[in-house]
Amino acid sequence: MGISFSTWRAGGYANAATPRAADPASLQQLGGETMGTTWSLRFDNPRMLPLRAVRDAVQASLDRVVAQMSHWAPDSPLSRYNRASAGSTHLLPPEFARVMACALYWAEASGGAIDPSVGPLVACWGFGPAARAGCSGAVPDPRALAEARARTGWERLAFDPAQGTLLQPGGAEIDLSG
C-alpha cells in the first residue's frame, strides 16, 4: 500500500476556473518513501520544473508531517503530547495546529465517528507504537478496553485554535494515522 497524490499542475493555472487539458508531453511522475510506505505523484509540468526540485518539495512536506505528527517518531510534538502529564499545555507547530483544528471539526461533525483521541483504543487492540501488553490484536481484555475507552473522547481535548495550544487532560493519546 502506498500514498498516491492526484494530478497536480506545477506552475498553476492562468485561470483556475478554466483548466486546460494536460499535454501528454508534460505529464511526469516521481515518487519516494515516507511513513513506512511509498508515495507517487503524477503531474502536469508544462513549465518543465526540475523533477528533483518538485520531488524535494514533496518529500520535505511529508517529512514535516512525520516530524510534527507521527506517533512513531518519539521526539515529535504529537508523541511528546501523548507522553505528557495531565494539565500540561502544548504549543503546536502551525501545520499541526491546522490539522488538529480539522480533526476536531470532523470529530464533532461526525458525532465522534472520526476521533483523533483513539490512541489508547488503537494500542489496546495491539496496533501502533504504544501497543499494550495483554492487548495483542485479539479481542482485548474487557478491563483493558474499559480503561482505554475512559481515556478517549475528542471532547476531552481542549484546543485553542487562536493560540495553537492543546491541553493534555491526562492519559490522552492522539492518533492521526486513521
Q: Which residues make up each language-model segment?
A:
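A contiguous, well-ordered beta/alpha segment that forms the leading edge of an enzyme domain
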Residues: M1-S177
